[in-house]
Amino acid sequence: MRLLILLLFSFGIIYSHGDEIPTQKQVLVSIVPYKFLVEQISGDTCQVFSIVMGNRDPHNYELPPKYIEKIRQADLWFRIGEGFERTCERIVSCKQVDLAANIDKIMNGSCCQRFLNFDTHTWLSPKNLKIQIESIAEALIAIAPEHADLYRKNCSLLQDQLDLLDQKVSSIVSQSSQRNVLVAHGAFAYFCRDYGFVQHTIERSNHSELSPKDIVRVEQTIRDHNLHSVVLLKHAGKRSSAALVRKFNMTPVLLDPYAEDVFSNLIAIATAFADL
């Protein structure tokens, strides 16, 4: 009987230690494309939470009170320069990494000049992503050095995938004869810079209603470049999108710059631009 108790006790200790789950680091990102990237590098060593989720527009996003406690628990925050991040700054106490810091930014772009001095859609460029995933890996190693080998390995794999992605996107758009793109919202400047397109934006930088002068400007752009399609964003209001299509008599092309799987999304954007 003593032997049986001893064996059961020993088994209990082994089982207990064997089932022990390492504590995951809590990592915060501002938008879901970076949730995807952090998870590709961190594997199951981190729990990643995106502040903006779903079809919400980060440019006019307001932080829901229910997220405040989750944000306070973060060990690390990857930020991108969006206006709503200023509110989050007052809540978080963890280390912050600005993923736009080492990027060749497009300054004073057509997107949101009222709030920002550069275009924040930096992830829509494989060249930018190669820089950003290095920053992600380094920051993860700093908070979880025991997983350094895993993070370096996964970062290296992502670098190779981004090289292949860049080649594939270049191949897709190489035969495109229309290099001018009319967009409702100026989200694609980095993609256009990388792959030889020119972005023409309908929306005003302060998100206000189009003036008669703006309408004349857009109509002139359509005539000058023989444009037949307009790129609309999935998170934009359906009424405003439909109004633009009717106003300018254009074929709508629906894209989502904030899709989580940024690799697949860049292929989707390339395919759409090639068919304009």
From Swiss-Prot:
Keywords: Metal-binding, Periplasm, Signal, Transport. Its main location: periplasm. A divalent metal cation binds at H59, H121, H185, D256. GO terms for biological process: cell adhesion; metal ion transport. Pfam families: ZnuA. InterPro entries: Bact_metal-bind_prot9, Lipoprotein_PsaA-like, ZnuA-like. It is found in: Periplasm. The keyword Secreted does not apply. One of its GO terms (cellular component) is periplasmic space. It comes from the Bacteria. GO terms for molecular function: metal ion binding. PANTHER family: HIGH-AFFINITY ZINC UPTAKE SYSTEM PROTEIN ZNUA (PTHR42953:SF3), HIGH-AFFINITY ZINC UPTAKE SYSTEM PROTEIN ZNUA-RELATED (PTHR42953). Belongs to the bacterial solute-binding protein 9 family. This is Putative metal-binding protein TC_0696. It comes from Chlamydia muridarum (strain MoPn / Nigg).
